[in-house]
Amino acid sequence: MADMDFNDRTVLVTGAARGLGKQIARAFHALGARVALNDLKGDAIAAAIADLGAGPRLAAAEADISTAAGCENAVRATLERYDRLDVLVNNAAVNWEMPIAAHTEEIWDKHVDTILKGSFFCAKAAIPALKDSRGNIVNIASELGLHPIVSNVAYCAAKGGVVNLTRALAIELAPDIRVNCIAPGAMDTELMRDCAAASGDAAAYYRYYQNFNPLKRIARPEEVAETVVFVASAAAAFVTGAIIPVDGGSIAGRL
């Protein structure tokens, strides 16, 4: 399908060394895109690039996107390598599940800075290049940004912020730049495995999330990545400001 062709297009994915971000990079690369992978550590990016097949259409954009300067560095690295930017995917995230009483200022700031602040300042840094290409932004929120759960306040708050950030960016950046948001449900990624291990009962953790939605299973990251690619493609040219759950019906079951 021509509308899903990303040949001669450049995509920057934050938090791309593992998990959903890596699958998003894989999906765009398979459709012909040049993909810049951002993450904190260069060796982790290099390993991801090797796993994706290496080659001239894959590049590192190492930076700490929890700071405005880091966001600028990630965008700059992409433009220095490929001289254009067509799609920004704000995917980077952290998640430490704990009750309110256990939250420190450092933990709160790490969630908000990585998830919400990073999404805003990456978008801000990318605006000139995206205007030139009439490109678009895809923010990765979460079903928990739409219906929170207990013992996850900082993550839920930051992801909820991404939802409204998407809408605010969409109305201000139109008509030149589209901005949309994917709100995934629980996915079988390294981040989820880390959370399961930290819970003290990984089997119970997985059972909880498997029963969280009507489909009674956890998503595969490639299922979410395919939705990201669609929203970023010409097939979704009339879609902006949308919040799209990819959650197995979890939110519908809570309306």
Model segments located where?
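Short C-terminal tail/terminal secondary-structure segment
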Residues: 2, 147, 229, 240-255
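Substrate-binding pocket helix/loop in short-chain dehydrogenase/reductase
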Residues: 99-100, 104-112, 209
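Active-site loop immediately N-terminal to the catalytic Tyr-X3-Lys motif
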Residues: 101, 147-153, 216, 234
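C-terminal helical subdomain
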Residues: 105, 181, 203-235, 239, ...
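Active-site helix of classical SDR
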Residues: 123, 158, 166
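Alpha-helical segment proximal to the catalytic Tyr-Lys
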Residues: 128, 171-175, 237
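Residue(s) in the substrate-gating loop at a strand-loop-helix junction
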Residues: 142
